[in-house]
Amino acid sequence: MDKANTNRSKKEVCGGSGEAKPTGKKRKNERTLTNKNVNAKKSMMDFKALTRHNPSDDMTGAYNFLHEYISVDVYSYEFVEKMKSLKKKLIEKMGINAKDLSSSIGSELLKLIWRYDVKSVVEYNLLKIEQANFTSHPQISFNNSEPKKTNL
C-alpha cells in the first residue's frame, strides 16, 4: 500500500527552505484497509447473497468465488491466512470501538465471515487480556469458554 508523505510541512509547500523529514506518525485520515481487502469483503457478502452459504462453512467454494475478485494468483492456504488476518484486524478494530457492537457493520461482517457474535468475541479477548495480567496470581481462576457461534 502506498503511503503519502505524512510530514509535509508548510515551509515546503510555500517555498520555504529545508526538507521535510517523515516522522513515522500516522495521519488521522490514513487508510487501514487496502482495496484488495475491501474487494475481498465485498465479494464475501456477494458469495453469501448468491449461494446462500456462509463463507466459513464452504471455504473451498468461497475461495473459488473470491479468486475472480482478487487480481493475484494465490493458493488456498494463503487465502485462509489472509482471511484470518482480516478477522484479526476486524476484532481489534471492534475491541477499540466497543460501544454498541451488535449494530455495527463490522459486527455483521464478522458474523458473516466467521459466525461469531462480536460481543462474545470481544468479551473473550478481554478475558484473555485479564488472564495475562493476573498470571502471577494462581489462586484466581477464569472461565475459559470459547466465544459463542451464531446460527445464520
Curated annotation (Swiss-Prot):
Protein name per its UniProtKB record: Probable transcription factor At5g41765
**Keyword annotations of the record:** Transcription, Transcription regulation
Q: Which family, according to the similarity comment?
A: Belongs to the GeBP family.
For the keyword Transcription, the answer is yes
Q: Which Pfam families match?
A: GeBP-like_DBD (PF04504)
Could you tell me where the Basic and acidic residues compositional bias lies? Answer: 1-13
**Where do the segments described as Disordered lie?**
1-35
